[in-house]
Amino acid sequence: MFDISFSEILVIAAVALIVIGPERLPKVARTLGHVFGWAQRYVNDVKSDIQREIELDELKKWKASVEETGRSIENSVHTELDKFRETVEAGAEASAMPPPTTAPAGESSPPQNSSPAPAEPAPPPVQSTKNSDPAGPGVNRERETAE
């Protein structure tokens, strides 16, 4: 973390032993260890907070991008739906209008009825009872007379 070599640490320890003295040196070393540990934890906490903020920033950007894409898709769907609605309404209006007549100016045509006239049912066929064969038309009569 501080780029201090082992020989530099030995020099610092020797100076501390001379200045502080052998009785208080263990207590001071323990206190310095706690302070360095606290500083390292604080630095690590700050790093992790910064990392979380960066990730949140990236997620917010990604979320905004996804929302923008969603709005774009929604707008295009609404646009296409409106076009489709206009087409359907135009088709409904066109089918509701009567067809234009194309008769020449000199001739007059009778008004055309859009529905066909109802047809009358045809009368049932009348069968003649004279010379009619009750057995039917396909029966061989020669056999009956020969017996």
UniProtKB/Swiss-Prot annotation:
The gene is tatB. Residues 103-117 have a biased composition (Low complexity). GO terms for cellular component: TAT protein transport complex. Gene3D superfamilies: 1.20.5.3310. This is Sec-independent protein translocase protein TatB. HAMAP family: TatB (MF_00237). Its main location: membrane. Part of the twin-arginine translocation (Tat) system that transports large folded proteins containing a characteristic twin-arginine motif in their signal peptide across membranes. Together with TatC, TatB is part of a receptor directly interacting with Tat signal peptides. TatB may form an oligomeric binding site that transiently accommodates folded Tat precursor proteins before their translocation. Belongs to the TatB family. InterPro entries: TatA/B/E, TatB. It is found in: Cell inner membrane. It comes from Nitrosospira multiformis (strain ATCC 25196 / NCIMB 11849 / C 71). Residues 67-147 are annotated as: Disordered.
